[in-house]
């Protein structure tokens, strides 16, 4: 299965894929379109896209109102005080991806409580980690009760989050660690996927599923990927 990560998951619905909506915060953070236009740049130095979207979004109430429990909603928790409020708002059967990989987040303040989102009513309760996540931290997330992992988000730089092939060496190490140590974990491998070749790299490391996002910036490359991978289910 191919997952389409935000922001493209908000707009695309394609057979043989699952779109992840978001990321949503407790309160609205306006200015998404302008932030994309102002900060999205291609880096020829790193061969990838850099953005500083900064979690601009219409807020979790919008997601709850507009998406059913078949969707996967990505949430970002900015501080520990938001956790009980989000738990109260979000339906227990709404599928979630908890994004703990953005530099905006007070990670140390929230990670001791994020396991509260796990319950038997959710088919998906994924934790999305940074490329710089340590194996020790992955072990802690597993100990908290997480069994679904998304490796990984963009690489943090001074100019924003870097996507593209630079992520692959980091993500594959995380995928391999999880599948070697915790065979029952479900792992989505993502970052730098453009062709079947990258799919095979992640699959060799043990990834169960795969994710794309910035590939969608390239209509021609995305169409080729769709024709050769997504449409025939070649993954």
Label each region the model flagged.
Residues 13-15, 83-90, 132-144, 176-182, ...:
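Catalytic cores of alpha/beta
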């Amino acid at each position: 299965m191919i997952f389409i990560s935000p922001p493209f998951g908000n707009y695309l619905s394609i057979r043989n894929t699952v779109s992840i909506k978001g990321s949503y915060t407790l309160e609205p953070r306006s200015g998404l379109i302008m932030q994309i236009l102002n900060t999205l740049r291609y880096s020829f130095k790193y061969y990838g896209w850099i953005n500083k979207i900064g979690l601009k979004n219409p807020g979790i109430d919008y997601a709850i109102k507009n998406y059913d429990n078949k969707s996967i909603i990505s949430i970002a928790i900015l501080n520990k005080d938001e956790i009980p409020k989000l738990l109260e708002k979000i339906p227990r059967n709404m599928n979630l991806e908890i994004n703990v990989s953005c530099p905006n987040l007070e990670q140390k303040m929230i990670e001791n409580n994020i396991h509260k989102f796990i319950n038997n009513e959710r088919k998906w309760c994924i934790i999305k980690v940074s490329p710089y996540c340590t194996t020790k931290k992955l072990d802690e997330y597993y100990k908290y009760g997480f069994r679904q992992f998304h490796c990984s988000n963009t690489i943090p730089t001074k100019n924003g989050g870097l996507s593209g092939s630079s992520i692959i060496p980091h993500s594959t190490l995380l995928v391999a660690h999880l599948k070697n140590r915790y065979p029952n974990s479900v792992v989505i491998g993502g970052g730098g996927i453009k062709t079947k070749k990258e799919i095979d790299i992640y699959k060799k490391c043990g990834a169960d599923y795969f994710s794309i996002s910035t590939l969608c910036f390239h209509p021609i490359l995305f169409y080729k990927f769709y024709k050769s991978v997504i449409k025939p289910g070649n993954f």
